[in-house]
């Protein structure tokens, strides 16, 4: 159909040209002959390279100015509000206005088309990049702040790589506009280039050359745009070994964590109300209950992701890890670096040990896009443990694992919890998981917005625990 469309266009053009002279409308055959004569002359290619150089210069300047402005506008709303009126001013004026201004400033020559290209595509770059920064996955930022990754590294390894797809999409958007802006600038105020050659042909009434140049410009523009559309850049970044992150933790001063009369509201509705709970140090505590009972909210309060509660939360250690329900892996870092970024002091062999514990040591240098959901969950757990936390929060940590991996992982975590000084709090709906891994359990109710049953599990017979927990869940405490 594509070839049929082109053929039909050429036939119609040829038929119409029969009713006019070549001075008014040359036919496609003579136009193609003229085009081949032009491209056989080195002067033509010199003109073309000059136009291409102007386009490239305008693009580089636009990216050099627009990307940093868009980056900081995306990070800082006040800065965005400050520059937005000026950028919109650039965006609103027609091209001929900038040609007139640039002719006053630069005269006729190389810089006028470059300036026109800059002012035409610069606003699009700024707005697209700022929108890209604002749409950066907030879960990744939340994860980075939990692990106390410095702001400089968040910018370097999360924010900045996240704008690369937006830079690529912006190039695809502006490609045709850039090419046309340069040619128009050359046509009206150039001293060299394809647009300038087109203006000379027009001035001398050489209609065959006008049409030949037009066909070439259309073809070159299409090729330029199609080439950019094929760009599909997925950033891949390696973490340097010399980054430093320090955490000061007084390990000899860890105490039981206490929640005293804690109330937290969301959209003017209490999620938990006057909650009192103790999480014993170096023990594993479990939270169960129906959806909406506040289990995950408690994890978020302890991790300081959620704020604005009333009451008191005491003795939360500085180093807190969180095994999220979603994986929250940084897409452009491999598995090794997704772990290293939370604890840069680890060597690759140390990271391999954590991955081996999860049964995925062979995935150490694979990127997240190549991992299954279960593998991502295991990397999530390995990262949390590699942080060497004093409080480990786990939100449905085994939900996407197969049974064999799940049982093996539970046994591994039991060993870790018994040998290391880790206080852990787990949210789960599975009585088996809770009975195997927990020392104490709290059952929460969405109706009461509080704890309705609690049980010390250490002194219970293991074979009875799962049934006891299941019965309590079904009967609501």
Predicted regions and their residues:
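Helix-to-loop junction immediately C-terminal to a conserved catalytic motif
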Residues: 303
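Conserved ABC ATPase "signature" region
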Residues: 145, 348-363
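Catalytic Walker B motif of ABC-type/P-loop ATPase nucleotide-binding domains
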Residues: 392-396
């Amino acid at each position: 159909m594509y070839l049929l469309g082109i053929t039909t266009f050429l036939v119609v053009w040829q038929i119409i040209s029969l009713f006019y002279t070549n001075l008014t409308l040359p036919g496609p055959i003579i136009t193609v002959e003229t085009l081949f004569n032009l491209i056989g002359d080195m002067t033509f290619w010199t003109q073309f390279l000059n136009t291409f150089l102007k386009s490239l210069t305008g693009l580089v300047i636009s990216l050099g100015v627009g990307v940093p402005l868009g980056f900081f506008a995306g990070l800082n709303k006040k800065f965005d509000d400050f520059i937005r009126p000026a950028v919109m001013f650039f965006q609103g004026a027609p091209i001929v206005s900038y040609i007139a201004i640039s002719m006053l400033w630069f005269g006729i020559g190389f810089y006028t088309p470059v300036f026109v290209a800059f002012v035409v595509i610069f606003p699009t770059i700024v707005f697209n990049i700022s929108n890209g920064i604002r749409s950066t996955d907030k879960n990744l930022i939340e994860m980075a702040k939990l692990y106390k990754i410095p702001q400089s590294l968040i910018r370097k390894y999360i924010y900045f790589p996240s704008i690369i797809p937006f830079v690529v999409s912006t190039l695809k958007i502006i490609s045709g506009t850039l090419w046309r802006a340069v040619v128009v600038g050359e046509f009206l105020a150039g001293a060299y280039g394809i647009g300038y050659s087109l203006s000379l042909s027009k001035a001398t009434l050489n209609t065959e050359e006008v049409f030949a140049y037009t066909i070439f410009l259309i073809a070159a523009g299409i090729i330029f745009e199609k080439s950019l559309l094929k760009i599909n850049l997925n950033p891949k970044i390696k973490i340097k070994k010399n980054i430093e992150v320090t955490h000061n933790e007084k390990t000899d001063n860890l105490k039981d964590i206490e929640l005293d009369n804690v109330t937290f509201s969301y959209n003017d509705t209490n999620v938990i109300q006057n909650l009192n709970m103790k999480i014993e140090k170096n023990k594993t505590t479990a939270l169960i209950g129906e959806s909406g009972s506040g289990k995950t909210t408690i994890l978020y309060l302890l991790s300081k992701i959620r704020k604005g509660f009333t009451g008191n939360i005491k003795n939360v250690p500085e180093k807190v890890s969180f095994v999220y329900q979603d994986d929250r892996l940084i897409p452009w870092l491999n598995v090794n670096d997704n772990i290293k970024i939370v604890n840069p002091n680890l060597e690759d062999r140390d990271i391999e040990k954590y991955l081996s514990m999860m049964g995925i040591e062979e995935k150490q240098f694979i990127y997240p896009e190549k991992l299954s959901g279960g593998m991502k969950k295991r990397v999530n757990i390995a990262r949390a443990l590699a942080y060497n936390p004093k409080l480990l929060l786990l939100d449905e940590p085994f939900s996407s694992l197969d049974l064999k991996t799940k049982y093996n992982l539970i046994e591994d975590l039991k060993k870790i919890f018994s040998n290391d000084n880790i206080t852990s709090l787990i949210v789960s709906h599975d009585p088996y998981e809770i009975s195997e891994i927990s020392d104490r359990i709290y059952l929460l109710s969405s109706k009461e917005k509080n704890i309705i049953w609690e049980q010390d599990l250490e002194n219970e017979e293991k074979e009875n625990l799962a049934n006891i927990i299941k019965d309590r869940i079904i009967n609501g405490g």
